[in-house]
A protein has these predicted regions:
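An acidic/histidine-cluster motif and surrounding catalytic segment
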Residues: 2-180
Length: 180
């Protein structure tokens, strides 16, 4: 899901990727100023706080969570397992969904912001990734990016049957003002 964008006319095979979107207000989405993305932040620029958007996949990488129909799984396994087996799975999914390298159209949908994210534990940031250098920085508190009520941070609360969750991204707007 990393790098996911809304489909636009500047992307490969853009004329074949539908640009429709479904939006809904979702209290589990943090306010838009908390949303971090590399480059443009379409969510912050185009939608009000707490908006979750469902749309066709565009420019996604990483494989935190995916769901496929049985037919889609068979097609993906045929494509990835027989034809492009030297590629990483996340790049295979990207090509499969974006019709790159002569691929046919597949109805791949996603949500922004993502429903699942990696949890970064308290400690050395270099432990976060085997492909990115975290340097010597130290994280004082664990965080799950863009997930307001992180399962990892609320596990004990859930197991105890409580509903007083740790809110990583509490609302900061003035309730008397209209949400922007």
């Amino acid at each position: 899901h990393c790098g996911m964008r809304f489909p636009s006319s500047t992307q490969p095979a853009s004329e074949k990727i539908p640009r429709g979107r479904v939006m809904r207000i979702d209290e589990t989405v943090p306010e838009k100023h908390y949303l971090r993305q590399n480059g443009r932040n379409d969510l912050e620029e185009q939608y009000q706080n707490h908006t979750r958007v469902v749309h066709y996949v565009s420019e996604g990488i990483c494989t935190t969570a995916y769901a496929l129909t049985q037919k889609g799984a068979r097609n993906f396994l045929r494509t990835g397992g027989l034809h492009d087996s030297a590629m990483t799975v996340d790049m295979l999914l990207r090509q499969y969904c974006q019709m790159e390298r002569g691929k046919t159209f597949h109805a791949c949908l996603t949500v922004q912001p993502a429903l699942f994210q990696q949890h970064h534990r308290e400690g050395a940031k270099k432990a976060d990734s085997n492909i990115a250098d975290g340097g010597d920085e130290y994280r004082k508190k664990g965080v799950t990016d863009v997930v307001r009520w992180s399962l990892r941070m609320n596990w004990d609360t859930l197991l105890d049957g409580d509903t007083k969750f740790v809110d990583q991204y509490p609302d900061t707007y003035d309730p008397g003002m209209e949400r922007r």
